[in-house]
Curated annotation (Swiss-Prot):
Annotated organism of origin: Mus musculus (Mouse)
UniProt keyword Transferase, yes or no: yes
An annotated GO cellular component: Rab-protein geranylgeranyltransferase complex
Regulation affecting activity: The enzymatic reaction requires the aid of a Rab escort protein (also called component A), such as CHM.
InterPro entries according to UniProt: LRR_dom_sf, Prenyl_trans_a, RabGGT_asu_insert-dom_sf, RabGGT_asu_insert-domain
Record lineage: Eukaryota, Metazoa, Chordata, Craniata, Vertebrata
EC number(s) stated in the UniProt entry for this protein: 2.5.1.60
MF annotations from Gene Ontology: Rab geranylgeranyltransferase activity; small GTPase binding; zinc ion binding
PROSITE patterns the record matches: PFTA
Keywords: Leucine-rich repeat, Phosphoprotein, Prenyltransferase, Repeat, Transferase
PANTHER family assigned to the protein according to its UniProt record, in alphabetical order: GERANYLGERANYL TRANSFERASE TYPE-2 SUBUNIT ALPHA, PROTEIN FARNESYLTRANSFERASE ALPHA SUBUNIT/RAB GERANYLGERANYL TRANSFERASE ALPHA SUBUNIT
PFTA repeats: 44-78, 88-122, 124-158, 159-193, 207-241, 363-397
Protein name per UniProt: Geranylgeranyl transferase type-2 subunit alpha
Assembly information from the UniProt record: Heterotrimer composed of RABGGTA, RABGGTB and CHM; within this trimer, RABGGTA and RABGGTB form the catalytic component B, while CHM (component A) mediates peptide substrate binding. The Rab GGTase dimer (RGGT) interacts with CHM (component A) prior to Rab protein binding; the association is stabilized by geranylgeranyl pyrophosphate (GGpp). The CHM:RGGT:Rab complex is destabilized by GGpp. Interacts with non-phosphorylated form of RAB8A; phosphorylation of RAB8A at 'Thr-72' disrupts this interaction.
Length: 567
């Protein structure tokens, strides 16, 4: 044993580490206590900077101590000469950088650096950009550093083109850089603003095509990396329409005018207001939502005075102007007619996608073919499958309808954890297709039965629909947006899994409601139907509530205007 170095046992090592931790904790607590005592006594001097440096150098996430340092620095600003302050700031910046090396994702450290640079008369922004580049090279997904870089770029008025070039360099080095792709999505609309396109408006076509080529190179290089797929989806969504007034309807019998927007809005807010003229004369009216609540809505209504519906005159011309986007609709109510309307011509480009130029269509078609080839090589790549579906939607939703449904089945098998999301997305696309077919047929009846729907959408497009068939689906609820169907007379919703009827309210023309074989368990679920004044027929057969004792009497009392209730 002589001549050998004694090795500590595991118990001795554990005890040594315990004593070391206790010693560090004592120093930490004593330094913290000293800082708080000085702060309470108003002794905001350089000794506080020294004490907080000891603690923050090891644990940069002590927010209160950063506050103490700011208080001290503000105090010293009034006491130091410009030369002394410059030296102090230089030391503070160096200390902050050392803290960032300890924890590059420290909220307090990055915030303190922002605060410090904001107080300098002539900050060295070039140095800060270089600092960001170094930390992003170490961790390209450090969102704290990305936030700080955006702050620096804004303060230094760095041109968006320069920042875009910076993302180019990072993406070229590594395609799997979600933050760089995201930053591009922020910079491109700044670089290429399009008049009258809104915050979600389109990019110039040459830019869009260039970006599509770039991102295609990325996801073909690494098909399993999600960054490029997300960016590709963002590019496909770069053509959302701005706010428009898409439909105007006038009912003589109800003395009511209805308008429908492309998205939910509040009339009379900073977004804009509605101006109504009848026979070229301005008419002051009160606008309201179908449920009377002042919240964003696709549909807004107003009551019409009797004079504006005088049937002795040959016609009345109604014009509504939306000041938010300077769009208008006009319709003419003829003598002897009970209603009139005006709506946009409903092609698929105008309803659910933007019209494609020949060049863009060719590029997307090429991408679709390439993605199909990639899918053959990577049959379980969910991003590739989803992108194929989205490309088909962008190109021609009706032409690819059957093929799209087949890809949905494959995608659900590949990604069962997102089955509910995929069911809802599939339902959205099926509703869109059915609306398109209805519009092309120029009818007011919409058949959505036997489509395995899990959600309803685009109800704002159905203001003129009189008959809606939702039977034999998997709908758990009918959304409040159903109130947009101002002309609906017959609603078939049998053989679903409806648990309540909260969305079936304020439908002025609803006469027949079929709800067989759902999951309605209590009569209270039908209370909202009292807001449908013309409802005369209600079929509830096959629901649990039909087993309630005295259900018919309770329903007759709740819904006195309904003459026929089947239980």
């Amino acid at each position: 044993m002589h001549g050998r170095l004694k090795v500590k046992t595991s118990e001795e090592q554990a005890e040594a580490k315990r004593l070391e931790r206790e010693q560090k904790l004592k120093l930490y607590q004593s330094a913290t206590q000293a800082v708080f005592q000085k702060r309470e006594a108003g002794e905001l001097d350089e000794s506080v900077l020294e004490l907080t440096s000891q603690i923050l150098g090891a644990n940069p996430d002590f927010a209160t101590l950063w506050n103490c340092r700011r208080e001290v620095l503000q105090q010293l600003e009034t006491q130091k000469s410009p030369e002394e302050l410059a030296a102090l700031v230089k030391a503070e910046l160096g200390f902050l950088e050392s803290c960032l090396r300890v924890n590059p994702k420290s909220y307090g450290t990055w915030h303190h650096r922002c605060w410090l640079l904001s107080r300098l008369p002539e900050p060295n922004w070039a140095r800060e950009l270089e600092l960001c580049a170094r930390f992003l090279e170490a961790d390209e997904r450090n969102f704290h550093c990305w936030d700080y870089r955006r702050f620096v770029a804004a303060q230094a008025a760095v041109a968006p083109a320069e920042e875009l070039a910076f993302t180019d360099s990072l993406i070229t080095r590594n395609f799997s850089n979600y933050s760089s792709w995201h930053y591009r999505s922020c910079l491109l609309p700044q670089l290429h603003p399009q008049p009258d396109s809104g915050p979600q408006g389109r990019l110039p076509e040459n830019v869009l095509l260039r970006e599509l080529e770039l991102v295609q190179n990325a996801f073909f290089t690494d098909p399993n990396d999600q960054s490029a797929w997300f960016y590709h989806r963002w590019l496909l969504g770069r053509a959302e329409p701005h706010d428009v007034l898409c439909c105007l309807h006038v009912s003589r019998e109800e003395a009511c005018l209805s308008v429908c927007f492309s998205r939910p809005l509040i009339v009379g807010s900073k977004m804009g207001t509605l101006l109504l003229t009848v026979d070229e004369a301005p008419l002051s009216v009160e606008w309201r939502t179908p449920d009377g609540r002042n919240r964003p809505s696709h549909v807004w209504l107003c009551d019409l005075p009797a004079a504006s519906l005088n049937d002795h005159l040959p016609q009345h011309t109604f014009r509504v102007i939306w000041t938010g986007s300077d769009t208008q609709k006009e319709c003419v109510l003829l003598k002897g007619h009970q209603e009139c309307w005006c709506r946009d011509s409903a092609t698929d480009e105008q309803l659910f996608r933007c019209e494609l130029s020949v060049e863009k269509s060719t590029v997307l078609q090429s991408e679709l073919e390439s993605c199909k080839e990639l899918q053959e090589l990577e049959p379980e790549n969910k991003w590739c499958l989803l992108t194929i579906i989205l490309l088909m939607r962008a190109l021609d939703p009706l032409l690819y309808e059957k093929e799209t449904l087949e890809y949905f089945s494959t995608l659900k098998a590949v990604d069962p954890m997102r089955a509910a999301y995929l069911d809802d997305l599939r339902s959205k696309f099926l509703v869109e297709n059915s609306v398109l077919k209805m519009e092309y047929a120029d009818v007011r009846v919409l058949h959505l039965a036997h489509k395995d729907l899990t959600v309803l959408c685009h109800l704002e497009q159905l203001l003129l629909v009189t008959h809606l068939d939702l039977s034999h689906n998997r709908l758990r609820a009918l959304p409040p947006a159903l109130a947009a169907l101002r002309c609906l007379e017959v609603l078939q919703a049998s053989d679903n899994v409806l648990e309540n009827l909260d969305g079936v309210a304020n439908l002025p023309r609803l006469r027949e409601l079929l709800l067989c074989n759902n999951r309605l368990q209590q009569s209270a679920a039908l209370q909202t139907l009292a807001s449908c004044p013309r409802l005369v027929f209600l079929n509830l057969q096959g629901n649990s509530l039909c087993q309630e004792e005295g259900i018919r009497e309770r329903l007759a009392e709740m819904l006195p205007s309904v003459s026929s209730i089947l239980t």
